[in-house]
Design a protein with these regions (language model features):
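NAD(P)+-binding Rossmann beta1-loop-alpha1 motif at the extreme N-terminus of oxidoreductases
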Residues: 1-67, 95, 99, 128
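Rossmann-like NAD(P)-binding element
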Residues: 34-37, 49-115, 119-121
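Rossmann-fold dehydrogenase core element
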Residues: 116-134
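Short hydrophobic/aromatic-rich motifs at helix boundaries and adjacent loops
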Residues: 15-16, 87-90, 129-131
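Glycine-centered flexibility motif
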Residues: 5, 105, 129, 134-135
């Protein structure tokens, strides 16, 4: 099974366009979107729409996403800052291994980023707070 170079969580406007940009530069990208009522099928719509025929690996669960990425894994989140980031980290950690990297591409408060660095590094992983969007 082909493995992705990076995993991306969040297929709203910023995440979708970032995934397309990475893929256009030669990266294979595993994509996942948190599911809320009425938003089921976001991943499939993306890979069968704007991502059709491109190097995307659809993931429908955190486990699928993590398993789809080459080691050491790099998982980037493009989701709303605050509690959603903490919740996603909690879901990711049990499936990741020492040396893996979690990147927060949202607009998180730097105090939250500093706290997350300590929490994630205590598990042997790396955490990068790299705000891309002010949204």
């Amino acid at each position: 099974m082909k493995k992705a170079d990076i995993g991306l969580i969040g297929l709203a406007v910023m995440g979708e366009n970032l995934a397309l940009n990475m893929e256009s530069k030669g990266f294979t990208v595993a994509v996942y979107n948190r599911s809320f009522p009425g938003e089921e099928g976001v991943v499939d719509r993306f890979v069968n729409g704007r991502g059709k025929g491109k190097n995307f690996i659809p993931a429908h669960s955190i486990e699928e996403l993590v398993e789809a990425v080459k080691r050491p894994r790099v998982i980037m989140m493009m989701i709303k800052a605050g509690a959603p980031v903490d919740e996603m980290i909690e879901q990711l950690l049990p499936h990741m291994s020492p040396g893996d990297v979690i990147i927060d591409g949202g607009n998180s408060d730097f105090h939250d980023t500093e706290r997350r660095v300590k929490e994630v590094e205590a598990k042997g992983l790396y955490f990068v707070g790299s705000g891309i969007s002010g949204g």
